Amino acid sequence: MEYDKMIADLYPGDQIEGYYILKTAQAKVTANGKPYLNAALSDCTGVIEAKCWDYSGPIGTADEGKVIKIRGTVSEFRGTPQLTIERLRMADESDSYDLSRLVPVAPIDLQEAFESVEQMVESIEDEYYRNVCTELLRRKGEALRSIPAAKSMHHSFLGGLLMHTHNMLRTADFLSDLYSVTVDRSLLLAGTLLHDLSKVEEFTLSALGLVTDYTVKGQLLGHLVLGACEVAEIAREQGMPEDKSVLLQHMLLSHHGQPEFGAAVIPQCAESELLSLIDLIDSRMEIYQEAMDETPVGTFSKRIFAIDKRIYHHP
């Protein structure tokens, strides 16, 4: 029996006991009518799918994002490690574990990234766009430094939203220079900074700071609408010309590209088109990186829901 072994180091045949984060949990029933828990456990090194057969206990979806203590055996299912849980319980105040082992954090210097974001905002030449960005960064900067960018899709670790935003700003800055005849750099950088910033109000966070669910506002409105409304409000307060306010709102409302991907409207100017593509590039590359981290070199990953395919981790 091995204790508190990191998920990245697990291999078929390992018998383990320790503390992990219950990333997802769903009560299910087999074809024979027997109950079981379908779950995923995580630590700072990765995620492993897990099953607890013949389980009809209290642990379920409401416990996602919390720390759980388990005992189990690692096997292999369709070429991917899977954990069969033999014993489990939620951790409580009497338990002793190292949180730094469990909570995944963005693999960047967050302070350095935040300072770079601030410098990008200061470089926005249009004073109206710059002032809106400065105000929203003042309101939400602390949250931006820490919250994930998503529950599970991409950048779902502490500091993930900052990493995603910083990556996108760097890309937007480069592309605004490449396409300087076509693109308004100030509008593109402002839209890039603000496109996901209302996820601060959209998400419910666990005590560990990970996304567990959506707030009522997040569920009913979503971060696109929340962000556009906030931009409109600040724009009025600051006396921004209406045409500029509408363009900046459009950037936020259209950045998912197409209605089937959650866009309120489709991109209808060069800057909004570019923003939706930059967002897609960065989120897609993070999905690939996370899959490669969990997939041995020379093999294919498990099917990835977000992109509906497996990827090959080449040497």
Describe each region flagged by the PLM.
Residues M1-I16:
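OB-fold nucleic-acid-binding modules
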Residues Y20, G65, M168, D279:
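Divalent metal-coordination and catalytic microenvironments
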Residues A25-P35, G46-S100:
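OB-fold single-stranded nucleic acid-binding module
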Residues N38-D43, L205:
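Short, acidic/hydrophobic/Gly-rich beta-strand patch recurrent on exposed beta strands
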Residues D95-G218, Q258:
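Acidic/His-rich, divalent-metal-binding segments that scaffold phosphate/diphosphate chemistry
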Residues M153, M163, F174-E294:
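Divalent metal-dependent catalytic cores for phosphoryl transfer on phosphate-bearing substrates
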Residues S276, D293-E294, G298-P315:
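N-terminal intrinsically disordered, cationic/polar leader segments
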